[in-house]
Structure formats: structure tokens, C-alpha cells
Amino acid sequence: MTEPKDIVLKESEEVEGTPIEGPWLDEVSSLEEVLDYYERIGFQATHLGKAIEIWKKVEEKRARGEEVRVFLGYTSNIISSGLREIIAWLVKEGKVDVIVTTAGGIEEDFIKALKPFILGDWNVNDALMREKGINRIGNIFVPNDRYIEFEKYMIPFFERVLEIEKERGKPLTASEFIYEMGRFMDEKLGKEKEKSVIYWAYKRNVPIFCPAITDGSIGDMLYFFKEERGDRELIIDIANDIVKLNNLAVTAKETASIILGGSLPKHAIINANLFRGGTDYAIYVTTAIPWDGSLSGAPPSEGVSWGKIRAKADYVEIWADATLVFPLLVWKVMRS
């Protein structure tokens, strides 16, 4: 009979690897030095540390003149938050080559160049908020006057799009529509446009794809515009954008896919990479769960099974709120 002590204190094999270790605060003097420990802390800190190393590798290759085309995908709530300014900076500095987002990621970026969103609270009387005309995104408040102001700009913008389409003899694609929106911002808006993703994408000629561009306030404005003008036709071409997006992946020597959240932007990017045999580098930041079979919760390894991420790709998934980790990730990579 085996003794209880022998069961509890069973001999183990030696394990080779990195010792778990955090920063000794007397020995660090900056956030940068603290982040240097992340890969050794464990749990999601280790995943963030790996993401830092992956993105640094991509940046080092690009600095040497090697082509790694960077695809950035994010859901609308990312732009609702203060991550908008970080993404705008990345575009301004030439760190991103292709963007895919949802309709909210477009319209909220434009609206914030008109009036800011306001920090609120999670615990409020939402029925009362509705009576007051204040919309809520988590603990971020968006008064309806933001959308009223947005409409004042969108109606003349739609008129311009109609003229462009008439001159061209064909509709704009969604990415061209967004590019023209950036041009419109450049002409019509003040200094606040300089913190806009759309504005800098226009200035740096970075395509922004939005396959579901009507799924939000832009769609609402299009509805009003079309209803009020009867048979006047404004068309946004989605089909040709899928060709453009896929070819941006196919023609790249290597690609990196950085995805905040899930849904449509995530799949549009990795599916485009399917046509080249998968992306070479992938960083996912998500709070979605994998066990419901959703695309949003699918880990990078599941993407390998579809051929959307290369089997030998360098990838990591961080289970965390992007507002907590993305600023640290960008700050550390770009300072390095």
C-alpha cells in the first residue's frame, strides 16, 4: 500500500523553462521596465508579453525594409472609447496598412471630431436616460445631439457622393466612400479632425473597409436621405471591396493581423488571408469565449484549421478588455 505522504509528495520530473517572476519594485523605475517582466508573470500578462514580442518582430522587419502588411481590425466600441486616439496615431505614423471595422467605427470617429463622448456610469436608470435623449455605451454617454450634428454633415456629404458617382458613371465602394469622408473632414472640420482615424487614413492613403457600412447611424442617415428624395439613388458597392481587400492580402509577402474584439472585422481580415495560405502573425485581444462556437470567440488555433492562419504562424490571444491592454501594447512596441 502506498503511503499517504508518498501520494502527496510524489516525485516529479525536472521542468525546463522560464521561471515565473515579477518586477521587484525597488529595481524598476519606469512602466517600460515593468512591461519587460510581463512574459514571466504568467496568465494573461504572459500573453500580453508575447504580443509585444510579436509586434516588435513585425516592426523590426518593416524597419529593415521587409514587407509585412499590417491589417488592423476593431469593433465600434473600440472607437467609442479612448482607444480611438491611439489607432489614429498608429495610422498617422504609418504603422497600419489596412483597416477593417464596423459602421460604428466609422460614424463614431466622425462624430467625435464634432463633439466628444462623455464619461458616465454603468449603473444608471436607462429608461430615464432615454427620456433625456442620452444613449449609453457601457459607461460612455452619447447625447442625441451628436447624431443631430452628424446628420448636418452627412446630408451634404451624400449629395457630394451622388455627384461623384454621376461623374464616374458607377457607385463608390465602401472603402472609397470612407476615403471621400476623410476628404470631406479635411475640408469642413477643425483641429479636432487631427485625432480622427478616418482623417489620417485619408491623408496616409490607408484603406478602411466596412462591409456592413449601413448597420448604424450612417444607415439611418441613408434611409432618411433616400426617403426624403424619393427615387434619387445613392449606391455603395460592397462587391468590389472584397476583391480589393483579398488582393491586399494575396499580394503581400507577409501579413500581420491585429484584431481588437471579434465579429465582422475579425473574419474579414483572416478570411482575406485564407487566399494566401494564412496570415503570418496574429494578435487577438478579446473577451469572447470559445465554447459557444462563435467566430468572435474562436482562438487563433481554430483559424489554423481553416487555413486562415498559417500553421507555423507566430500568434497569441489575450483574453482581456482591449482598453486595458492595447495602450500598453502599443506604447511598449513603439518605444522599443
UniProtKB/Swiss-Prot annotation:
Gene3D superfamilies: Deoxyhypusine synthase (3.40.910.10)
Claim: Transferase is one of the keywords in the record: yes
Catalyzed reactions per annotation: [eIF5A protein]-L-lysine + spermidine = [eIF5A protein]-deoxyhypusine + propane-1,3-diamine
A GO term from the CC aspect: cytoplasm
Keyword Protease attached: no
Keywords recorded for this protein, A-Z: Hypusine biosynthesis, NAD, Transferase
SS bonds (residue pairs): none
Co-factor(s): NAD(+)
Enzyme Commission numbers on file: 2.5.1.46
Active-site residues per Swiss-Prot or TrEMBL entry: K308 (nucleophile)
One Pfam family cited in the UniProt record for this chain: DS
GO molecular-function terms, A-Z: deoxyhypusine synthase activity
Pathway participation: Protein modification; eIF5A hypusination
Family: Belongs to the deoxyhypusine synthase family.
PANTHER family: DEOXYHYPUSINE SYNTHASE
HAMAP family named among the record's database cross-references: DHS
Protein's job: Catalyzes the NAD-dependent oxidative cleavage of spermidine and the subsequent transfer of the butylamine moiety of spermidine to the epsilon-amino group of a specific lysine residue of the eIF-5A precursor protein to form the intermediate deoxyhypusine residue.
Name of the protein: Probable deoxyhypusine synthase
Species per Swiss-Prot/TrEMBL record: Thermococcus gammatolerans (strain DSM 15229 / JCM 11827 / EJ3)
Organism classification: Archaea, Methanobacteriati, Methanobacteriota, Thermococci, Thermococcales
